[in-house]
Amino acid sequence: MKIGILGGTFDPIHYGHLWFAEYAREKFKLDKVFFIPNRVPSHREIPIATSKQRYEMVLLATLNNPYFEVLPIELEREGVSYMVDTIRDLSTYFSNAELYLLLGNDAFRDFLKWKDPYKIVEKVSIIVGSRGEEYYTNDLKDFIKTFENKIFFLDFPYYPISAKEIRDRVKKGLSIKYLVPENVEEYIIKNSVYCEEDQKDVK
């Protein structure tokens, strides 16, 4: 069994996330892709939407894809969400599966700053959503060379959108149609997500 792992704040989840996951699933013949929302991200700002809201939006977004599944394991874990802990748990539970960590190129550039990156790559292969020629530090280039049999670059048609742009558009009362799935758009509007700056909450 081949399992893809896509972590993130998903604040909110959008078509860029979904397209990357589906493209990687198809190219690498993954049997399942797990979406794993962070509780408290280690290298990003605290999310604006609550953990419950972000989890529910990811559930809605992945509802109609039988290959996608949402795991709340980081939301249920207290404190900062570290991928090394998540990978340890998944590799134990799915001991016979091949695990593939899906990373956007921005996240991959910071990968060596993550907690225990070498422990992560011991247990998973990495699929990097590359947007063409990128500029990496020498340390990252050495890392790529060392683990060249476990790091794959996926040249996929990039969906030019960011979660911040979506939040800003919501705050300004602008349309987010075609940026997020329709049921996620309805959820954001119905629950007034991203309308208030002081909404930050990790619960």
UniProtKB/Swiss-Prot annotation:
CDD domains: NMNAT
Domain of life: Bacteria
Keyword annotations from UniProtKB, A to Z: ATP-binding, NAD, Nucleotide-binding, Nucleotidyltransferase, Pyridine nucleotide biosynthesis, Transferase
Record's catalysed reaction(s): nicotinate beta-D-ribonucleotide + ATP + H(+) = deamido-NAD(+) + diphosphate
Enzyme class: transferase
GO term, biological process aspect, one: NAD biosynthetic process
Pathway(s) served: Cofactor biosynthesis; NAD(+) biosynthesis; deamido-NAD(+) from nicotinate D-ribonucleotide: step 1/1
Signal peptide span: none
Entry GO MF terms: ATP binding; nicotinamide-nucleotide adenylyltransferase activity; nicotinate-nucleotide adenylyltransferase activity
Pfam family for this entry, one: CTP_transf_like
Record InterPro entries: Cyt_trans-like (IPR004821), NadD/NMNAT (IPR005248), Rossmann-like_a/b/a_fold (IPR014729)
Family: Belongs to the NadD family.
NCBIfam families: cyt_tran_rel, nicotinate (nicotinamide) nucleotide adenylyltransferase, PRK00071.1-3
Role summary: Catalyzes the reversible adenylation of nicotinate mononucleotide (NaMN) to nicotinic acid adenine dinucleotide (NaAD).
Matching HAMAP family: NaMN_adenylyltr
Name of the molecule in the record: Probable nicotinate-nucleotide adenylyltransferase
Gene name tied to this protein: nadD
